[in-house]
């Protein structure tokens, strides 16, 4: 094995190597066995997954990540999940614009419904179940794009705790919180 420093070092593959190592070692995985006094919890509002990513997304989450890393260096067990806000009006608008459709709750579901390959000039009225299906399909794609970005940036979140606000579990938790008021 040569210890000589190369004339031109290569960074190819370093990012993937370290990301894979951190993931396999559970470097940022939250340890639920820690006592409450040892835990530092970060609750960030999940980014709205309804469009294009921009530098503002990276800028705002970098601040939080710096705090998470600082707390870990100080010995805290950091609870830092990541979520996606993909439930509500922004998602509906994104689906309407992306597919050229609008929800008509009076229409019956169409068996084997497929979205138009290109958005029509006038919005196509579709049933609520078909509309919800398109919402779930598009948000899954958008969530993956967001996750790819955050992983590439190297956010130190616990990926095993990721959630989405459109998921049944998150909706039920939200409803329980509102009902408890």
Enumerate the predicted regions with their spans:
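N-terminal, positively charged nucleic-acid-binding surface of large information/translation enzymes
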Residues: 1-181
